[in-house]
């Protein structure tokens, strides 16, 4: 199994370490950085947190955005965390400025509000119930986190925090508004790798 992590900025190294920890449990696998379309020969893709506008602009400039969208549309499993969730959603607004124009992959039937909880100083940790993916309650890190304000079509909420969607899935697309790679647990990565294995 080969997992690619989009590696422009953000917590891509932490995602790679989390995936390697899961590989240590379930068997062999490889994690590679994805920066260009030629790097997309993988079984699953992770789009990490960071700054969604920057990630989108760099991916567009380096010719990754359209091939990535095509690969996801063809069914490759993808995990988007925080900024990655923003990139994958069809609708994006900003908590302060409203409608946001930025390069998106836009493949998931979801609407996301950027900076829902405020800016950097409003970052926090919270306990999220992972019952929908057969997990328990775990603490996760939220950094300038977005909120998934609604899902439709085949998309469904997997976890909420104070009635706000923080994790959702549509077929092979999984998104979280929190940072599982910074939270000391591999439960989200384990679930994602089970999706890839199917």
UniProtKB/Swiss-Prot annotation:
CDD domains: GATase1_PB. It catalyses: aldehydo-D-ribose 5-phosphate + D-glyceraldehyde 3-phosphate + L-glutamine = pyridoxal 5'-phosphate + L-glutamate + phosphate + 3 H2O + H(+); L-glutamine + H2O = L-glutamate + NH4(+). The active site is at residues 82, 179, 181. InterPro entries: Class_I_gatase-like, PdxT/SNO, PdxT/SNO_CS. L-glutamine binds at residues 50-52, 114, 143-144. PROSITE patterns: PDXT_SNO_1 (PS01236), PDXT_SNO_2 (PS51130). GO terms for molecular function: glutaminase activity; pyridoxal 5'-phosphate synthase (glutamine hydrolysing) activity. HAMAP family: PdxT (MF_01615). In the presence of PdxS, forms a dodecamer of heterodimers. Only shows activity in the heterodimer. Catalyzes the hydrolysis of glutamine to glutamate and ammonia as part of the biosynthesis of pyridoxal 5'-phosphate. The resulting ammonia molecule is channeled to the active site of PdxS. This is Pyridoxal 5'-phosphate synthase subunit PdxT. It comes from Metallosphaera sedula (strain ATCC 51363 / DSM 5348 / JCM 9185 / NBRC 15509 / TH2). The lineage of its organism: Archaea, Thermoproteota, Thermoprotei, Sulfolobales, Sulfolobaceae. The gene is pdxT.
């Amino acid at each position: 199994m080969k997992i690619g992590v989009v590696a422009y900025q953000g917590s891509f190294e932490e995602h790679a370490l989390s995936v390697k920890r899961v590989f240590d449990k379930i068997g062999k696998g490889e994690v590679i950085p994805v920066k260009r379309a030629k790097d997309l020969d993988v079984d699953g893709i992770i789009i990490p947190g960071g700054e969604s506008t920057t990630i989108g602009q760099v991916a567009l400039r380096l010719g990754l955005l359209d091939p990535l969208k095509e690969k996801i549309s063809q069914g490759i499993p993808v995990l988007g965390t925080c900024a990655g969730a923003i990139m994958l959603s069809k609708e994006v607004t900003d908590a302060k400025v409203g409608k946001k124009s930025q390069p998106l992959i836009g493949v998931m039937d979801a609407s996301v509000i950027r900076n829902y909880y405020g800016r950097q100083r409003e970052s926090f940790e919270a306990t999220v119930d992972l019952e929908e993916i057969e997990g328990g309650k775990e603490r996760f890190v939220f950094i300038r986190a977005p909120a998934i304000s609604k899902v439709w079509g085949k998309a469904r909420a997997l976890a909420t925090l104070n009635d706000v969607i923080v994790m959702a899935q549509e077929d092979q697309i999984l998104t979280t508004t929190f940072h599982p790679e910074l939270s000391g647990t591999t439960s989200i990565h384990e679930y994602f790798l089970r999706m890839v294995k199917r």
